[in-house]
């Protein structure tokens, strides 16, 4: 498993031509033996507008600004219109209300949203674009020297988020029974720091800048995602309408994402500089996030298994009542046409 975390969808407005789908872009693709998108180019000069929602500061945000700056989206016939959101799940809401064409969603949030809106989740996952293992368990070393020491001690979590899942897996690994589990619900990094300083909490999962703040308050890294055999994955999602009426545009978008990922992998320092220039995120932070991330573009059985494992836990935890088949909310037709090896055959 490797590192990081996730953008997704298109609406009926596109079918009506509101976003410019009337300007058809002719596209020819040449599949390279190694699966590279280097030769995937747009031959016609016209572009089509795509309204993309990104998670501010997320890897999908990086992909959008770097791909635009390098002219990659333009090359593939896309005039990318990017809107930032506080979380990936907000991009899904914006797609539903017709504000966006494509957005993103991370694994846990996606499983939960689908589970709670099964009949109304009018969208499809079109590909995984990143996987990461950057989260870690931070503990007060004076209180926790072994996982079993977590019994009866405060464990911070943000209810309804991925941290609930990580906490559950931690307790399972430690063999701590339910009556010895002491969850402390928080709603922000600042709140977490407060309960850490007061001693109410001795452990919590965190990543990135939030993890650094915990370290500044004396917490130490104790357990990694690799130790639990888990990762954070994120996916692009598109509306059923765009997939049905403008699959070629979805192909263009995915081709541009693939080429952008390859460029970032080959030029991580320059990519971090672009991110800083276009978003204000410090270059060293952007570089660290890129280094901690595995960029890819696929959706295979391992993605299904990953989402199913989260879904099984969520159903057991009562996060939603009705089970579902994740494959009913996936459409890899466009991805498979571009990169056959990226999907399950």
How would you describe each model-predicted region?
Residues 107, 179, 183-184, 188-277:
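Pocket-lining segment of extracytoplasmic ligand-binding domains
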Residues 29-177, 183-187, 202-208, 221-224, ...:
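Short, glycine-/small- and polar/acidic-enriched structural segments
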Residues 75, 117, 227, 296-303, ...:
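Short, solvent-exposed loop/beta-turn-alpha elements that line the ligand-binding surface or hinge
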Residues 244-321:
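Secondary-structure end/capping motifs
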Residues 18-33:
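Bacterial lipoprotein signal-peptidase II cleavage site
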Residues 1-19:
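Sec-dependent bacterial lipoprotein signal peptides
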Residues 315-345:
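Conserved C-terminal helix/tail region of periplasmic/extracytoplasmic solute-binding proteins
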Residues 65, 70-71, 93, 97, ...:
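Solvent-exposed, polar/charged alpha-helical surfaces in well-ordered, non-transmembrane soluble domains
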